[in-house]
A protein has these predicted regions:
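Solvent-exposed, amphipathic alpha-helical segments
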Residues: 36-43, 90-93, 97, 175-182
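Hydrophobic/aromatic-rich alpha-helical bundle segments in the mid-to-C-terminal region
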Residues: 124, 142-212
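Helix-turn-helix
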Residues: 32, 40-74, 78
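Hydrophobic/aromatic residues within well-ordered alpha-helical segments
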Residues: 79, 83, 87, 105, ...
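Residues at secondary-structure transition points
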Residues: 20-24, 28, 70, 74, ...
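N-terminal intrinsically disordered/low-complexity leader segments
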Residues: 1-28, 211-212
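Short alpha-helical scaffolding segments that buttress acidic/His motifs in well-ordered protein cores
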Residues: 112-116, 131-135, 172-179
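Hydrophobic alpha-helical connector segments
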Residues: 85, 89-129
Length: 212
């Protein structure tokens, strides 16, 4: 971190454990800390990283880190929120693909299918392992799990609205969540052709009778 940024941050007395509003000069420091934490998670394949490790990687002092985030949980909260933003972006991309691939199907449902189809083609193992590590942070922590819960509530609200009461759509999406979980653990139970056929079957299954 530059001496200019350090001097700017020292102008305000910092109480340990209480995050401060980030000024313009400090925004780069904040992003360096977040990126350092992300890179450490990917390398170690665990979110169990110490503040000292993060400070060394980001080349910042612990006081500066606490100035911006207040605590390690302050960093984790933003990491989880950004991961949720990533999930929403993937879902939106899936819905856009579904509009082109499956114009006669509800995008909210078909989009989930296309999202997993794209996800299943990712070869980099750190992609799914990072997601697992981030989600592991939420175990037993109501603050960290809150943005994940809110996002899933919004997803299933869209699924329910699109399916007009057809619970088969919920079953299909829950099945896809199971496939995502297997993918996170890199458990491959279906060959590519079979997987694509199953995904098509799930879409057809979810779109049949609109009765429960």
């Amino acid at each position: 971190m530059s001496s200019t940024v350090e001097a700017e941050e020292k102008k305000t007395e910092v109480k340990r454990g209480r995050p401060r509003t980030t000024n313009v000069l400090g925004s780069n420091t904040k992003e360096k800390v977040l990126e350092s934490y992300r890179s450490l998670i990917k390398e170690r394949r665990t979110a169990d990283v110490s503040l000292d490790d993060i400070c060394r990687r980001a080349n910042v002092k612990k006081g500066s880190l606490l100035y911006h985030f207040g605590s390690k949980e302050g960093i984790q909260k933003i990491i989880v929120e950004r991961y949720v933003d990533h999930l929403e972006a993937c879902y939106q991309a899936g819905m856009q693909a579904a509009k082109e691939q499956w114009p006669d199907h509800a995008p909210a449902i078909a989009g989930f299918v296309e999202w997993f189809r794209t996800y299943s083609q990712v070869k980099d193992p750190t992609y799914s392992e990072y997601g697992l590590a981030v989600l592991s942070l939420t175990a037993g922590n109501e603050t960290l799990i809150a943005p994940v819960n809110r996002w899933y509530e919004s997803v299933f609200a869209r699924i329910r609205a699109a399916s007009e009461g057809n619970r088969k759509a919920l079953v299909a999406v829950l099945a896809l969540e199971g496939l995502f979980l297997l993918g996170h653990f890199r458990v491959k139970v279906l060959a590519s052709d079979e997987l694509n056929a199953v995904l098509d079957d799930l879409l057809v299954f979810s779109d049949k009778s609109r009765t429960a």
